[in-house]
Structures are given as structure tokens and as C-alpha cells.
Amino acid sequence: MRKRKAAALVMSLALASALTACGGGQPAATDTTAAKTEAGAAEAAAETKAKEETAPAADAVTIVLGHFGAPNEPVTAAAETFKSKVEELSGGTMTVEIHGASELGDAKEMAEQTSIGAIQACLVSQGTLDKYDIRYALVTAPYVYSGYDQAYAVVDGPFAEWVGDGVLESKGLHNVGPWDYGFRCLTNSKREVKTPEDVKGLKIRTPSEIQKVACFESLGADVQQIAFSELITALKQKTVDGQENPLSTIYNNSLWEAEQKYLSLTRHTWESVNLTVSDSFWEGLTEEQRGFVQEASNAARDQMRTEVQSNEQDYIQKLSDAGMVVTEVDMEQFKEAMAPAWDAVAEYEGSPEDMDFFLKMVDETAK
């Protein structure tokens, strides 16, 4: 198990001190008004200089940002774009300190650190946020969206408005906005998966998220919930036969070197990573600073969405070149076979009204 580094940031705010000039003895009787004026001006100048010297420190903000991405993943590049944009917009008064590759812990741990203000921000999926606001569970149910454009239309529009009612904030978090992560696909070491029946009996690793677990339990897989940081070891030691992740993660973590021979393009769920900040940190920013963070997040979002989509075919070709057997599947078959997962998600979410409201959003964005 990787040794995890707990990151806690203390921002130092220097107090402006006024420099005052004072004499040791009684003023001479011959002091003139001009001399007093000169002394007062010197004192005022000293005070002004002291305030100017300490002001930048008082305004300085550091954002410690944790995420899970490997060095070459789109999320890593997007995080760097966020950093450069924040620092550019703020004129250097705001800086971003990035810790990738789960250096600060897994998604659950990073969200917990963010919620208590130990770090300022993290990039986590809806499957992590649903522990704080259950409605996020609906976003990654199987086969909800016809494609990327519909997914973006839902999470950027009606869903964002719906969950912007303070529930997440009451748990110490604020979602600045969804970026992207992609549609998830299946890999395994045992056999080519062409149909839902081919999954039966395979030991499949998923995150500890009801949406993912239910998808593969509905296909008859032996689902093992294992942290991503332990995935490569589990695959190499054959603790599990396979796993499911977006193509960028499969490629950039070289899963063909971890006994993964077969790739099935199931595209069973879509999800994004969300720039999630500590709500207390967010409330402590000025309106202008929040604007910098929001604008930088939007820039990173747009970059990541473009990269995720444009690189899909490239990833598929590279995975094939690396020796993986790539299989297109009939997604309608998988959609039908995974239908029971909807019942599990609905039971977990707990509100038929929420489910109906969410599906109405999806239907409206399909028009």
C-alpha cells in the first residue's frame, strides 16, 4: 500500500504594522509648524510603505488541489491548465499546488480532506460526491446518455441547477463544475467479451460505488470493490480478472501490462470529474477571486472535454497496437442486461420523485 501524504495548508496573513516616529525628549520650544508638518508627513509615508509591503501577503491565496490522474491523462493536463489560468487571472496573488496520482489519498479521502478544509480542492467523480448529496448517484447510472453532448447538456444545465440548493455546501463542499472523464469500458484477462453472457463468472474490479457494482452484478460477474491505487497489483496478482474504466485510464496506466488482454467497448456509464472545493474556503474568497476560479475551471473543463472525445479513437488504436483484442459490442444488449442496475440505483438514492425528475431532464435534453 502506498504511503499517503496528508496535505494541510496554513495560509499566513501578515499584519500591516504602522511605523511611527517618536522622539526621546521633550520638543524644543523653537519647533515650528513646518517642522511638525514634515515629521507628520514622514510618519505617514512610513505607514504607507509598511502597508504596501504587507498587502500582497494578506491577499495571497494558495489552493492545494488533489487528483487521481496519471501523468499523461487528460485530467492531469486539465489540472495544469486550471493552475496556469488561476495564476494568470489573479496576477500571481493566487497559486495552485497540484498533487496528482492519488498522492493525497484516494477519492474518498481527498473529498474528506476538502470537506474539513485540510486541503482546498480535489477532482472527484459523481460516485464520490453522492456520499454527500445522494442525487449525484443518478448521473452515472448505466446507459443514460446518447453521447457526450447530451451528458454535458444534463450536468451543465438542469442537474447543476437542481443540486445547487446547498446540500453539498452543508457537508462542507462546493462543486465549481463538472469537467469530463469519459465513457467507461471493460477489460479482462480471460476471454473476449462480445455479449452480456460473456461477463458471467468473471471477477471484475469496480470502485465502491453502487452504480458500477450493480452494473456488473446484473451481468453475473463476481464484483470485487478495490481502490484504484491497488488496481494494478490486483490485476497482476490475478486477484481479479478485469476492471472497467475510461479509455484514457486504461491506456495511460498501461493495463495491457497488467494481464489485460481483452478490451470491450461497452461504454456502459459516463461520468465526469468535478472541481470540488472546500465550502469554507470558497466563502472566504472575494467575489473577484471566485470569478478567477470559475473562469479557470471552465477553461480546464473545455480543454478536457475536447481531449477526451478527440483522443478516443487514438486510444483504441494504441491499445490495439499494444496487443489488446478490441471488441465493439451491441450496446443495446448490454443496456437491457444492465437494466436491473437502475433498480439498485433507485433504491440507493431512495426517492422515486428524484429519479423521475432526473429522467425528465434526460428526456428534455434529447429533444
Q: Regions from the language model: what does each represent?
A:
Residues M1-V10:
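Bacterial N-terminal signal peptides that target proteins for export
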Residues V154-G164:
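Signature of the catalytic double-stranded beta-helix
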Residues K36-A42:
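Short extracytoplasmic/periplasmic juxtamembrane "stem" segments immediately C-terminal to an N-terminal membrane anchor
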Residues G23-A29, K36, K49-Q150, F159, ...:
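N-terminal secretory/targeting leader peptides
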Residues A18-A21:
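C-terminal motif of bacterial Sec signal peptides marking the signal peptidase cleavage site
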